[in-house]
Amino acid sequence: MPVTSRPTTRVAAVDCGTNSIRLLVADVGPDGTLVEVDRRLQIVRLGQGVDRTGRLAPEALERTFAASREYARVIAETGATRVRFVATSATRDARNRAEFADGVRAAIGVEPEVASGDEEASLSFRGAVAGVAARHAGPYLVVDLGGGSTELVLGTTSPDVVLSLDVGSVRMTERHLHSDPPTPGEEDAARADVRAALDRAGEVVPFGRTVTLVGLAGSVTSATAHALGLSSYQRERVHGAVLGVEEVLAACDDLLHRSRARRLALGFMHPGRADVIGAGVLVWSEVVARVRADVAAEGRELTQVVTSESDILDGIALSLA
C-alpha cells in the first residue's frame, strides 16, 4: 500500500510586540519545515508610555488596529487556513488590554493571545533553534530582545530554563535615555539597571552552560547589520551571521553613541527603530559581556555570537502545523 505524505498547511502568524507588529504567512509541513510565503513588519510602538502609565495609549492602539486590518487583507489574499495572533510584553503590562483584544478581534477576526513571559520565551526558542541547530551545537542561550522585555531561554532540543526580564529597547529608552545622543549619566543609569536585572537572572539561568549564544529581534539584527557594514538591510546576510564578541560590542557601542540623525543615515536602519536602538544595543552588549564572563568562569571561552532571523514569529507559525 503506498505511503501518502500529509500535505503542508498554510498558516499565518502575528507577533504583536512593544515596538513592532509582524506577520508571517508560511507553508508548514508535517516534519516542521517552513516555507515563507509573505513576511511583513510595521513599527506601531504599541508600548508607548506603558512603563509609565500602565495603559496602552489611544494613538498606539489605533496604529496597531490599522496594521492588523492590513494584515487581515494579506491573510485573506494568501489563503492561510490557520491564524494565531500573539501579543507580548506591552499588552501583558497594560490595564486596558481588554480594549486591545476587542480592537484586534474586530480587525483581524481572531482572538489575540496575551502570552506569558515564559510562553513568549518558549516560542522564541523554538523558532530560533530551528534556524541554527544544523550549524551550531547546544546548549543554546536564546536571547529575544524586544521593546518591552527580554526573554532568556537556555536549552538544547527544548527549553530547560526560561526567564523574562522587564528590560527592552522602548522601556529602557523611556526610563533612562532621554537625550540625543544619551549622556554619560543616562548611559550609566541604564547599564546599572540592566546589570541588576542580569544579576537576578543569573540566579535562575546558568549562563555559564552556554555553548552557542543566539540573539534575536530588531536591536540584535540592526547591530549585526552594522557590524557587517551593510549599506541596506539584507535578511539573508544577517540570518545565521556569526560575529566575534568584540565585533558585536564595537557595533553596539557605535550605535549607542550616535545621534538619531546619524543612525538614520545608516542604510539598514528602520526609521521606527532609530530612537530606541541605543537602548536596545546597550542591553545586548550587557548580555553578551555577562554571558562571556560566566562562560569564562566555567573554564571555557565564548568568542562568537550567532544572529537568527528565525524567532518567535517562526515559533508561532510552527505551532500551527
Where are these regions (language model features)?
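A generic, well-ordered mixed alpha/beta core segment in the N-terminal half of proteins
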Residues: 141-149, 153
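A structural signal for short, well-ordered beta-strand segments
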Residues: 16, 40-42
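Structural motif
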Residues: 20-22, 149, 220
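Helical "lid/coupling" subdomains associated with nucleotide-phosphate turnover
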Residues: 6-11, 30, 44, 49-77, ...
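N-terminal basic/disordered segments at the start of proteins
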Residues: 6-35
